[in-house]
UniProtKB/Swiss-Prot annotation:
PROSITE patterns: ER_TARGET. Recognizes glycoproteins with minor folding defects. Reglucosylates single N-glycans near the misfolded part of the protein, thus providing quality control for protein folding in the endoplasmic reticulum. Reglucosylated proteins are recognized by calreticulin for recycling to the endoplasmic reticulum and refolding or degradation. Its main location: endoplasmic reticulum. Induction: By tunicamycin and A23187. Induced 3-4 fold 10 hours after treatment. This is UDP-glucose:glycoprotein glucosyltransferase 1. Pfam families: Glyco_transf_24, Thioredoxin_12, Thioredoxin_13, Thioredoxin_14, Thioredoxin_15, UDP-g_GGTase.
Amino acid sequence: MGCKGDASGACAAGALPVTGVCYKMGVLVVLTVLWLFSSVKADSKAITTSLTTKWFSTPLLLEASEFLAEDSQEKFWNFVEASQNIGSSDHDGTDYSYYHAILEAAFQFLSPLQQNLFKFCLSLRSYSATIQAFQQIAADEPPPEGCNSFFSVHGKKTCESDTLEALLLTASERPKPLLFKGDHRYPSSNPESPVVIFYSEIGSEEFSNFHRQLISKSNAGKINYVFRHYIFNPRKEPVYLSGYGVELAIKSTEYKAKDDTQVKGTEVNTTVIGENDPIDEVQGFLFGKLRDLHPDLEGQLKELRKHLVESTNEMAPLKVWQLQDLSFQTAARILASPVELALVVMKDLSQNFPTKARAITKTAVSSELRTEVEENQKYFKGTLGLQPGDSALFINGLHMDLDTQDIFSLFDVLRNEARVMEGLHRLGIEGLSLHNVLKLNIQPSEADYAVDIRSPAISWVNNLEVDSRYNSWPSSLQELLRPTFPGVIRQIRKNLHNMVFIVDPAHETTAELMNTAEMFLSNHIPLRIGFIFVVNDSEDVDGMQDAGVAVLRAYNYVAQEVDDYHAFQTLTHIYNKVRTGEKVKVEHVVSVLEKKYPYVEVNSILGIDSAYDRNRKEARGYYEQTGVGPLPVVLFNGMPFEREQLDPDELETITMHKILETTTFFQRAVYLGELPHDQDVVEYIMNQPNVVPRINSRILTAERDYLDLTASNNFFVDDYARFTILDSQGKTAAVANSMNYLTKKGMSSKEIYDDSFIRPVTFWIVGDFDSPSGRQLLYDAIKHQKSSNNVRISMINNPAKEISYENTQISRAIWAALQTQTSNAAKNFITKMAKEGAAEALAAGADIAEFSVGGMDFSLFKEVFESSKMDFILSHAVYCRDVLKLKKGQRAVISNGRIIGPLEDSELFNQDDFHLLENIILKTSGQKIKSHIQQLRVEEDVASDLVMKVDALLSAQPKGDPRIEYQFFEDRHSAIKLRPKEGETYFDVVAVVDPVTREAQRLAPLLLVLAQLINMNLRVFMNCQSKLSDMPLKSFYRYVLEPEISFTSDNSFAKGPIAKFLDMPQSPLFTLNLNTPESWMVESVRTPYDLDNIYLEEVDSVVAAEYELEYLLLEGHCYDITTGQPPRGLQFTLGTSANPVIVDTIVMANLGYFQLKANPGAWILRLRKGRSEDIYRIYSHDGTDSPPDADEVVIVLNNFKSKIIKVKVQKKADMVNEDLLSDGTSENESGFWDSFKWGFTGQKTEEVKQDKDDIINIFSVASGHLYERFLRIMMLSVLKNTKTPVKFWFLKNYLSPTFKEFIPYMANEYNFQYELVQYKWPRWLHQQTEKQRIIWGYKILFLDVLFPLVVDKFLFVDADQIVRTDLKELRDFNLDGAPYGYTPFCDSRREMDGYRFWKSGYWASHLAGRKYHISALYVVDLKKFRKIAAGDRLRGQYQGLSQDPNSLSNLDQDLPNNMIHQVPIKSLPQEWLWCETWCDDASKKRAKTIDLCNNPMTKEPKLEAAVRIVPEWQDYDQEIKQLQIRFQKEKETGALYKEKTKEPSREGPQKREEL
């Protein structure tokens, strides 16, 4: 029956389903097995890994409040009210009841799906970083002495209510504080009043008391109340993090690299190894299922499982033929298990693959599975760009990049999708329709809008189609299709490129723009250039008083007398007289006219009777009507350039770029026949869809606010008492319920159907219709509507004055007409009401009956109009204040739920704006949604409502990548399918995966957690590779992620999520790696074991590895706006106002990339004092948290996600020719590095000024206890032989806690300085996955950014080297202008010739007779290295070569040797590095350093080689061991450092950990 009755009683999972005969047999076998193996007793070994924060635990209650704040501030404050009593004392005192009290309070505001996400979020501790950021901001204040909570009023602090009053009185004398996006502003706060920032812990009694006082002040309009979390007395324990992976990789033991020093294990809490952590499937037995079926046999099952695990765990190598089909066989094994367990099996097989592989080789693969996978792979490649073996994950069609997206950004996607799906569900759109609507791509278009340039107001200087200057150019558009070299600008006699300068002639920037225009014309650039001069257009201002008018009239005079081209030449003469930065004056104009036209009376041109005012009024009219923004403006084919592009150099570059870009557009149009030869080109350009009559930045801005229109209720605005108690969404629903609409054909309302047309655009006009500005807005909207059948209009009243019957006449009349009249009558009547005459007549006492229109039922109207019920206006006023956030009387337009406003009092918003608004809605969303809603067959008025509500919901989504339409792949034989629960909203999740890849190790546990969080329609397609030639997975893996917080049996929080490797094989050598989100820097903090070489046979029970999140990374890209290039060598610092410089960094030339190590909080980014600050200034910044025009760049890190900013810098005017990396780099004279050095006590030492050359910088890297032991011996050998002071630099990333703890003691003993440097491998640089190769990368790829600029030169010495000479000699060695010097490989040991790979093949031809150098010892001249951008060149070459897994096999050595032609190497004399493998014995006596190279012939272990080759090695080793024993004793007795009072003979041991 497919069951192999072998000794172990296994039953292959691939053989048959979980239930049935196999299990009956299996259970019978149990007793036999137990009898056979009852005497076997083997303790199982385990490895656990945890990751905690450096900061203290943050209360879950506070984290919960931040989850709700992300939804809305309203929910945040409601939750604060609901959770007043959940201090940690008010419930029965257990963690469990505290947690459930939080859930109970929060669940009132959350749907069931959101409740699951909320629990997951608390388990992830997502918002711990947010609370910690507030803690850091509070610490920066700092808090006043002895206050548990405190107030900060414009910088002054107190925790006394009385003092608060006094501080409020004087607040206006002090500047307002900078508020952050994450601050919590109380809804009724008055932004004009003094800001009170309240720091406290919600849930505490003190908070409640102060909070009530502040609310009453806020409601009275006296303060702007802002709340920030502050925990006076945090729990002194860290936060356990999750959302990371732990890899246990099997190391090659070809060369033995284990230290033989015995390690004492530490006590480990054995509850860490949980009872219920079984790997579900062992040799075909699904133990979880067995335990459910046979609870009575639990003890025996446990023993059986243990035996089976131990019998399978030892790994025997597989033959090549057994490897070939492993991917398909693993897929077959997964797909044969019951569907509900398939993900569990996939997780188990991929995460424990090395021990599962042998059993998997016995699995048969069906031809159906193989064929279906191969068929699907054609689609995967064609539609998704996936190769066999690649992985991908899609959630509702959104691509989740598994390499770059961490669990925190994935959580954001889930939460956002949930919001939209639940919104659509509430609107009655469900199932497949919901997913179809979701897939609509309705992002606001990125197209740049253009205005029409076919206006007589433009004075065109030239015309390419008629001017004789261009006669020699070809005039056919076919020329566009003629091939040319890239970047060549084609000269064709067509006005393809039109540039309009809209300027105020008297402004100081105009001269520069004139010069640019002149440059374009004189260089025959194919541009038609026009001007619009915007000047004072009042008739009594003439050109003898006003320079602007003078320029305009001078231009017009010459244009009429000669032509526009000469008129422009005259202007250039005028502006040439103006000094840079000054304005043109009337006398400049007069002197040029007198000189060029001496026979004309200047006064007749410029004076009061001038006839040369052409376009004076029209120009201003065009400028105002097009709404293009503040002057000067430059239009290219009608599209305005951005402000920063108007800098003269920038404008030149960007224009050339635009010409090339639009040429491509025209080529396509000509090729497709859209632009025939005889068509006017300008007409063609102006008929493009992005051309609008007016550009209104309010409408086109990317910052958009939307109403939430998804709620539904049966309330209306005419019940004011009920309306006031609704929440924001409820109020919006009531307003929408109460709307009656005007439309072009008439009015369609719930009762009256004289129209069957879905209108995709809905405008709500908000204003005080009893004031002229409100009526004007309404009138313009109605006028626009006359030309459009897509629009419906309704009104919201926002009265400016206190509401009374008398002052709301027109508002009441409009309301009454909407309530009582037919569509046409209402529209005609309201149009009359909106005209100014009506209001004046009514105010003068006219009867409303005079305005009656045909078809109106006046008596019905009058009844409602004269009713004293004012509820609708009261409700509208409250709605405007609380939801729309408008002041009394302010106007706004709400278009399909998008709030445009508040409009300024004098701001124009006319028909053209409504036209633009309608255009945009129809193009991006309206039409698409309308066609979907039509398919739902709902009644017309409801349908128009639905379009509006769906549009608001979808458009409010953050802009992201479009959803991918995946074809329906075949899923009968090759996919895991989990169906969603019926009748509930579900996520559509598609995964493509090869089950024997690193991605599968991460994806399987992630999908298992998702399955517990969300209802999903899941399909996991197998994407197997065939013909494998190598073991596909050589590591065990655990992904740390839990769907909910867990508790211990006594109702306390369990000790955080941890990774557990149970039942591991004991023979292999493992290395442990953490796989964390990109922006995390973690370090190993506590473990006595060597995590680089874990050998379980020598371990007592558990290897517990503890890591700490040391930093969150702030990354950025920086460009010089003038050159568009990264400012190589520019330095930034990051700090706080109290401590301005905490870390600093250098900008790379690659992508202008920089990174800074930070932690949660608010930080200030500055240019580093010295050359960076002298030469540059920060021009603009993006992705930061301070306003663009603020002096300081503030960055708030308040979550665990990546933060990437963009900074543009500009050279100061007097520094344009200075070079950052030029030789005067005394960057450091009194800079940061000095201030950051300190002695052992942590106090700053007085800086003993040392000449730079007086110190030798030695860099080294090590990982694992053996290499750290070698490293200490190398250091000792250097110190014994070198007389000059030494400073060691170590790469911190991979040092063990033991080494980091001992090194200060050793530094004190031997009187040297040291520094730990670190750098996170940038995400854009090809990643290495193997630890050894990553370390090699650090030896060569980041040398320019790893060290501060003060370090001019350093020596790299490998950890396993012994130095026998004074290294000053090497430091001073002349490199003859090369950036670095390496020693070539020895040639003298002849018997090794067969291993010298550089003597043949690629290397022999590439080196062309040069030497191949060894990377164990080198010297780098950093000044030269940076100057020739060696680092950037090395990274560039690495990026290209490293994509090929077969290149750079010795990365740190092959790369510099490969780059020998671009980055020259100076060959050091041979005696600088002797190594027994390659050098003969005779040369050993001359050796200045001895390296313990691996020997590929003998494979001798390093330790044995060291003792045999280097006589002094054992003495050094003993000396260090004695020091370690002494250190350990002092540590245990607490005497560490106490007696170390002797004065160091030279500048003492110094340490600065951060770079």
